[in-house]
């Protein structure tokens, strides 16, 4: 049964749209935990477009569940992670031009740089995950550089037409099986919604799903605590015959 990590970046997006003091991500993280979140995920981007450094520090000091920091593979971000000490760091690709993360990290051609970062994080007892596309070579490279976890990018599945979703789902299933056979832990996320999450949640071996935008959107109608509760129900009790 997968657990649920709630990404609260979009709470900060609303605040930063007016450079205001509300909504407060820390308060919303508390409500997410009340709704059943097993962890809180934030992406501290280099351009600080939503989550700010102070948010990360306050979350580390206040949340009762796990803190997962998504970050680019840069010296600045590694230094911040070593100071804040989140429970997990997920290394993601990052481009200032993108609206959101557009794909998995290129591990194969950046193994030495990533290996050094992972070693530094592990020395501080910070678990490290690599956000990758469901591609065999990227999984193998993630294992080779010492990552303990991978997070499978589900964006292609989420954006696929109904006819092609099953093909993308099969890729994710195969990648999960491959990663587990190598001794890697597996998370998944990106683009998942209340309508498409169950087939992913039903995949054997996926330990956590990180979901944000759809929960924040649903919260406008039912409140954040209820929105998280609804998603938690789908993640922990998925129907297994969606396809």
From Swiss-Prot:
Residues annotated for 3-amino-2-oxopropyl phosphate binding in this entry: 7, 18, 191, 212-213
Xref: Pfam families: PdxJ
Active site location: 43, 70, 190
Organism (species): Prochlorococcus marinus (strain MIT 9211)
Top-level taxon of the source organism: Bacteria
Site (Transition state stabilizer): 151
Name of the protein described by the UniProt record: Pyridoxine 5'-phosphate synthase
UniProt-listed PANTHER family: PYRIDOXINE 5'-PHOSPHATE SYNTHASE (PTHR30456:SF0)
Assembly description: Homooctamer; tetramer of dimers.
Principal cellular location given in the protein's record: cytoplasm
Binding of 1-deoxy-D-xylulose 5-phosphate, residues: 9-10, 45, 50, 100
């Amino acid at each position: 049964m997968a657990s649920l990590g709630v990404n609260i970046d979009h709470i900060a997006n609303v605040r930063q749209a007016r450079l205001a003091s509300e909504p407060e991500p820390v308060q919303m993280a508390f409500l997410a935990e009340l709704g059943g979140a097993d962890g809180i995920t934030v992406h501290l981007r280099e351009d600080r477009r939503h989550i700010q450094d102070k948010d990360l520090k306050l979350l580390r000091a206040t949340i009762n569940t796990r803190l997962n920091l998504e970050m680019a593979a840069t010296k600045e971000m590694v230094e911040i992670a070593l100071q804040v000490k989140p429970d997990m760091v997920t290394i993601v690709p990052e481009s200032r031009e993108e609206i959101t993360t557009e794909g998995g990290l290129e591990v194969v051609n950046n193994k030495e740089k990533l290996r050094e970062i992972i070693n530094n994080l592990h020395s501080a007892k910070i678990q490290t995950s690599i956000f990758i596309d469901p591609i065999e070579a990227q999984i193998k490279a993630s294992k080779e550089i010492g990552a303990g976890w991978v997070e499978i990018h589900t964006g292609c599945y989420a954006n696929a037409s109904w006819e092609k979703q099953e093909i993308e789902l099969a890729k994710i299933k195969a990648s999960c099986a491959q990663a587990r056979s190598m001794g890697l832990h597996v998370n998944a996320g990106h683009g998942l919604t209340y309508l498409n999450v169950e087939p992913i949640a039903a995949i054997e071996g996926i330990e956590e799903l990180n979901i944000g935008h759809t929960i924040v959107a649903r919260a406008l109608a039912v409140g954040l605590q209820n929105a998280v509760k609804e998603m938690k129900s789908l993640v922990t009790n998925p129907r297994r015959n969606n396809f």
